[in-house]
Amino acid sequence: MTNMSQPPATEKKGVSDLLGFKIFGMPLPLYAFALITLLLSHFYNALPTDIVGGFAIMFIIGAIFGEIGKRLPIFNKYIGGAPVMIFLVAAYFVYAGIFTQKEIDAISNVMDKSNFLNLFIAVLITGAILSVNRRLLLKSLLGYIPTILMGIVGASIFGIAIGLVFGIPVDRIMMLYVLPIMGGGNGAGAVPLSEIYHSVTGRSREEYYSTAIAILTIANIFAIVFAAVLDIIGKKHTWLSGEGELVRKASFKVEEDEKTGQITHRETAVGLVLSTTCFLLAYVVAKKILPSIGGVAIHYFAWMVLIVAALNASGLCSPEIKAGAKRLSDFFSKQLLWVLMVGVGVCYTDLQEIINAITFANVVIAAIIVIGAVLGAAIGGWLMGFFPIESAITAGLCMANRGGSGDLEVLSACNRMNLISYAQISSRLGGGIVLVIASIVFGMMI
């Protein structure tokens, strides 16, 4: 005789599937425990504003919206998926007043006071460069600056062309659109550009900065979207893409890498030691030893790329240590990226700024300039022996975004976080090149 009180098998399966559903690797009941804890903290306004409280809220918020972003149709394919969803939601939570001041302070302390972003980028640069074949690395660095220059040329040509369509003079297009977009972001681009503008022309730096940052904000959005599109193009036309590898190895003969022995936690820890030590040396060089070259300040991340590259070329690092640094880099890029994106949304994204900048002319001009940067870098990269997709992303889009945080947004949108070292060359050394160009262009306006 059938027991009528027994629930159907399909109902049991549904409950089992729900309980087995995982958010950031956690079963739903376990994540629910974390979320309820965060909500209690929110409603009682009781959150430690140190790194513990900051990481708690960043992990819990990043996990749920990361899962939504990677599953949302269209958004996950064309807009950038989980990382973009996370930083947009986090920015909205600040804009709408959903986050309390304590929550904002906790996240800001992680991002700004503890400078988690610097640690994240330093680890990724070290792992990315040490994992590259030494001769291949030398070739890529030598050919990369010309590729950046081609990206700037492409952006300038397309920018001038669309400017003429809208009746905007060439000098104004270069000054207010092309240079801010290609200038390496906010702190390393828009801010020093406004200072150069003021010192050369005598005009208001505030007026220039407010326009430049608005255009840069729009361009950053297009850079993220185009990164996702380039990833799709690369998958459909595989000859255009190295799937995360910049150099076309077929065009360059390299020796085999040394075989790697067993990797322990100690080699991974050494990877962290090297990341922080190379960052420290780069910081000392940038701030005290060589604060500028030819009047142009070189950012410490640009120095770090060169220092880690020299360390790789020196042969001091065993294959096991290199593999340990790569393992640490993979952990940061795969397990902590969603956490970081909450901080990017809270600390480095101003939705009001984006809203204010959205006019038809600004949107069209910014989009065309970014397309020019992509095409110029792709062509230049191909001529230098690089894959067009990877060179377009690093030397094109990572020049046209908003610097360090923009690099992470762009690379995460196209699943190429291992290219962070080249992205940093674009944002830092490339940004320095743009500052030199700006001083010449602004001088011609007088």
From Swiss-Prot:
Record's keyword annotation contains Iron: no
Listed GO biological process terms: citrate metabolic process; sodium ion transport
Q: Per the record, what is the consequence of mutating residue 317 to S? A: Retains 79% of specific activity, response to various thiol reagents is not affected
Known regulation of its activity is: In the absence of Na(+), transport is inhibited by the thiol reagents N-ethylmaleimide (NEM) and the methanethiosulfonate (MTS) derivatives MTSEA, MTSET and MTSES. However, inactivation by NEM, MTSES and MTSET is prevented by the presence of Na(+). In the absence of Na(+), the substrate citrate has no effect on the inactivation by permeable or impermeable thiol reagents. In contrast, when subsaturating concentrations of Na(+) are present, citrate significantly reduces inactivation, suggesting ordered binding of the substrate and co-ion; citrate is bound after Na(+).
- Positions binding citrate in this chain are 186-187, 402, 404-405, 428
Enumerate the residues binding Na(+): 181, 183, 399, 401
- Residues buried in the bilayer without crossing it run 182-189, 399-406
Query: Mainly localized where?
Result: membrane
Q: Which residues lie on this side of the membrane: Periplasmic?
A: 45-50, 96-115, 167-181, 190-212, 288-299, 352-359, 439-446
Entry's transmembrane regions:
28-44, 51-71, 81-95, 116-130, 137-166, 213-233, 265-287, 300-315, 328-351, 360-381, 417-438
Misc note: Allows the cell to use citrate as sole carbon and energy source in anaerobic conditions.
What's written under domain?
A: Each monomer has 13 alpha-helical transmembrane segments (TMs). Of the 13 alpha helices, 11 are single membrane-spanning helices and 2 are helical re-entrant loops (or helical hairpins (HP)). The protomer is formed by homologous N-terminal and C-terminal halves with inverted topology, each containing 5 transmembrane helices and 1 helical hairpin. A large cytoplasmic loop connects the N-terminal and C-terminal halves. The N-terminal transmembrane helice (TM 1) is not involved in either of the two halves.
Quote the subunit structure annotation: Homodimer.
Q: What is this protein's function? A: Secondary active transporter that catalyzes the uptake of citrate across the membrane with the concomitant uptake of sodium. There are conflicting data regarding exact substrate stoichiometry: the sodium/citrate stoichiometry was predicted to be 1, but the latest studies suggest that CitS transports citrate in symport with 2 sodium ions. Transports citrate as a divalent citrate anion, H-citrate(2-). Shows narrow substrate specificity and is very specific, transporting only citrate and to a low extent citromalate.
- From the Swiss-Prot or TrEMBL record, give the protein name: Citrate/sodium symporter
Source species, please?
Answer: Klebsiella pneumoniae
